[in-house]
């Protein structure tokens, strides 16, 4: 059986077209992406436990990676962006609801974001996250940016939770909604944020209503990468809510972290019935599938024996506006596999 590949972006495009949310957005600001005049500012938001006050909306935001960039696009905030940083291994950007926003926004680099790039772009805010751009080992942190007068907004999925460098402080979909509301407040587009959240909540509820339940729920493992030790999702990364709300039993739900590594022996012990492959990078989804199928320790794992492998795009699985569509997509795949 070939891996199931479902274009979740098409599900998302359909949902946004029905609601009027997405690349084309109208709102009380007149639909031009600029904040309304008046007494909205200053505003205070809480981001990863830190309260920050802004006297005006940032005008030259630099985003890092596809999910973060598309959060801005989903809110219609491309006119507030100096550009984005993203490798070119994150799928077909021409097929997403925000293709026009991609075309009008500068792709600053396909390599790693850094302080020099932010300075060259004259950024007033960098929207990234821990291990989504910010990294002490590389010397690129919010504290370093603050020294040169550049603000930061941390992706909520990446918030550190006090256990060393473990990440995650709330359920993944809640993290998405928190960021939409925070950015809605910061850029004075609260109505847009609430409309998107309502659309996503409706989409998730409809998918859950059709999802497998009870004893029919298959055990599901998310495979990102890695041969010696697999990189996977814990309870605080997007796949946890995507798998759970799609009608699966996430086998790594007890890991109180976001993206993390485990041992293959743990995977074998938990015997997933379905494996979801995260499709991105230099190693293709088919190459990942062939590795899983040929790796001797996995030979007796149910998902491998029955060839139950699903493929989702990277942007479906990290925190992004594509998460609700990925739930609907995976729910349909799980029903098909169980049928």
Segments (PLM) and residue ranges:
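Bacterial Sec-exported substrate-binding components of ABC uptake systems
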Residues: 1-71, 182-222, 333-339
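Short helices/loops that flank or line small-molecule/ion binding pockets
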Residues: 114-125, 140-143, 262-271
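Alpha-helical, coiled-coil/dimerization segments enriched in small aliphatic residues
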Residues: 232-259
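Second-shell loop/turn segments in exported
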Residues: 58-59, 105, 129-132, 165-170, ...
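Structured C-terminal subdomain patch of bacterial secreted/periplasmic proteins
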Residues: 170-179, 254-255, 274-339
């Amino acid at each position: 059986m070939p891996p199931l590949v479902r274009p979740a972006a098409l599900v998302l495009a359909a949902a946004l077209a029905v609601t009027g949310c997405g690349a084309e957005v109208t709102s009380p600001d007149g639909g031009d992406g600029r904040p309304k005049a008046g007494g909205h500012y200053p505003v205070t938001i809480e981001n990863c436990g830190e309260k920050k006050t802004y006297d005006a909306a940032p005008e030259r935001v630099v985003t890092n990676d596809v999910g973060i960039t598309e959060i801005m696009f989903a809110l219609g905030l491309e006119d507030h962006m100096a550009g984005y940083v993203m490798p070119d291994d994150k799928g077909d950007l021409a097929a997403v609801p925000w293709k026009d926003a991609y075309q009008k926004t500068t792709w600053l680099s396909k390599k790693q974001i850094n302080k020099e790039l932010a300075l060259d772009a004259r950024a007033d805010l960098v929207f990234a996250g821990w291990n989504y751009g910010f990294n002490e080992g590389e010397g690129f942190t919010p504290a370093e940016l603050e020294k040169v007068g550049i603000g930061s907004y941390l992706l909520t999925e990446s918030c550190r939770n006090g256990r060393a460098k473990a990440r995650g402080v709330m359920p993944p979909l809640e993290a998405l909604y928190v960021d939409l509301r925070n950015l809605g407040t910061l850029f004075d587009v609260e109505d847009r944020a609430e409309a998107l959240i309502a659309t996503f909540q409706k989409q998730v509820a409809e998918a859950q209503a059709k999802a497998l339940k009870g004893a029919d729920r298959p055990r599901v493992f998310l495979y990102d990468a890695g041969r010696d030790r697999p990189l996977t999702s814990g309870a605080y990364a997007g796949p946890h809510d995507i798998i759970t709300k799609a009608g699966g039993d996430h086998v790594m739900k007890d890991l109180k972290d976001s993206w993390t590594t485990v041992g293959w022996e743990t995977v074998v012990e938990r015997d997933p019935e379905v494996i979801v492959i995260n499709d991105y990078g230099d190693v293709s989804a088919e190459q990942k599938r062939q590795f899983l199928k040929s790796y001797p320790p996995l030979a007796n794992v149910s998902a491998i024996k029955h060839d139950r492998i699903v493929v989702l795009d990277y942007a479906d699985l990290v925190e992004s506006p594509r998460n609700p569509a990925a739930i609907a997509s995976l729910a349909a795949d799980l029903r098909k596999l169980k049928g």
